[in-house]
Amino acid sequence: GLKDMIKNLAKEAAVKLAGAVINRFSPQPQ
């Protein structure tokens, strides 16, 4: 239902946000 869709969207957003934060704060080989 709609609640599940919202839950999935929130989960994806949280995962993306966590990934961005981790990428920003972890040393990147350049």
Curated annotation (Swiss-Prot):
Its main location: secreted. Expressed by the skin glands. One of its GO terms (biological process) is defense response to bacterium. This is Nattererin-2. It is found in: Secreted. GO terms for cellular component: extracellular region. Keywords: Amphibian defense peptide, Antibiotic, Antimicrobial, Secreted. Probably has antibacterial activity. The keyword Transmembrane does not apply.
